[in-house]
């Protein structure tokens, strides 16, 4: 039975409340102080697990602006893949890879009771650190560095003093795909039941992060500090993508603690190109994953905070992005990470007519304070079009689960250890491949998802699975024995196409996007 931790936080007026203070997020000119007092209350029949340091579920009661709130938190059990690893280098350049224990981690998602639009992302490693959204406003909480004190500061983003007022951009100049025609055609189609199921299925982006040498130096070589920062960044990223049924478990971190393995320069396009080539030729040979970010402390020219390719998720060389560790605030840097990953998922910058119900949306070309947490209606349509046209099926492969603390619960719509599938209760299950009563796949199925899969069976041989996308392209057809569409074929080099220009390489050119 899941444990529930009840912590009562008593709000006290701090003597220096309202004065400026230096916190991890920067200089804060207005804040409240809270003193968390932990009270543990186990449900009847529950047993305390001595080996578990951080509970699966926690609940906090406290006040904000004199109003009582109840914060519910649940451990993010999709934060890591089971084969999570870390790599750093010895002084002589030797690669050292370890598999740290990550089952009993301290990173949570949550919500405010009686606030349907609330969200929260909290680290409970050393006190409470993170953010929560309450009645449309975002608050941050972090421990105050006072010896022998449980004092925490609660404050708003607008109370963080800005060090630089210059607008920080996603330096993208053109985010459309090679041709807008397939997008327009796709957006005019009514999704079939199979397509809608393909859209709605959980996506798992196996996520890898590389930390460049400048960032290691920025944190004085303290890999433990960088590691915890990255864990919270990825926790926030997952919180933002969860409404889209996207999860991004962290499969690994590589620290370039001795030197950079590529030439990281202030030119974002140049660095992105080198990083993609290195990933394809080196990193993918050592670690299977879907997507890689280079987290850097370099300052890119033209106020650029990040850059990524467009519509390239699952591509060996182009499924990458750059992110500058721009501010102490983890939420701001996480918003840049979400934005750049969005480009790889086929999403362009928002136009003025796009709407997400907030002042600023994730794919707005400039970063805003407080950072955005919602995608716009335009982003959702572009993402669905990307799934329809490019079919990034690497994101359908489920990573190994790390949840070894709680037993699986069949029917909760969460795939857990020992389950082959979990589509919810028998009344709500919409997956024809899954037996909702047993959470096992039906014995007769041949496939679940894929370009050549229909209603859990292979599509007949000869069924077109990839149409012609340019004059140089050729159609591909299902074999009747596999879910995969055959490799993309093109006219031989030299055959006149594309306005009589010779076919060359046979690859779509993807436009780079900069945040």
Swiss-Prot record:
Binding site for Zn(2+): 339, 343, 349
CC cofactor: Zn(2+)
A molecular function GO annotation: metalloendopeptidase activity
InterPro entries xref list: Disintegrin_CS (IPR018358), Disintegrin_dom (IPR001762), Disintegrin_dom_sf (IPR036436), MetalloPept_cat_dom_sf (IPR024079), Peptidase_M12B (IPR001590), Peptidase_M12B_N (IPR002870), Reprolysin_adamalysin (IPR034027)
Keywords: Cell adhesion impairing toxin, Disulfide bond, Glycoprotein, Hemorrhagic toxin, Hemostasis impairing toxin, Hydrolase, Metal-binding, Metalloprotease, Protease, Secreted, Signal, Toxin, Zinc, Zymogen
TM region positions: none
Enzyme's top EC category: hydrolase
Cofactor binding summary note: Binds 1 zinc ion per subunit.
Propeptide intervals in chain numbering: 21-193
GO cellular component assignments: extracellular region; plasma membrane
Disulfide bond entries: 314-394, 354-378, 356-361, 410-429, 421-439, 423-434, 433-456, 447-453, 452-478, 465-485, 472-497
Domain Peptidase M12B span(s) in chain numbering: 203-399
Listed GO biological process terms: proteolysis
Tissues and organs where the protein is expressed, per its UniProt entry: Expressed by the venom gland.
Span(s) of short sequence motif D/ECD-tripeptide: 471-473
Active site: 340
Pfam family, one: Reprolysin
Residues linked to a glycan: 263, 377
Signal peptide residue numbers: 1-20
Primary site of residence: secreted
Enzyme Commission number(s) from the entry: 3.4.24.-
General remark: The disintegrin domain belongs to the long disintegrin subfamily.
Record family assignment: Belongs to the venom metalloproteinase (M12B) family. P-II subfamily.
Protein role: Snake venom zinc metalloprotease that possesses hemorrhagic activity and degrades alpha chain of fibrinogen (FGA). May inhibit alpha-2/beta-1 integrin (ITGA2/ITGB1).
SUBUNIT field: Monomer.
Record protein name field: Zinc metalloproteinase-disintegrin BA-5A
Taxonomic placement: Eukaryota, Metazoa, Chordata, Craniata, Vertebrata
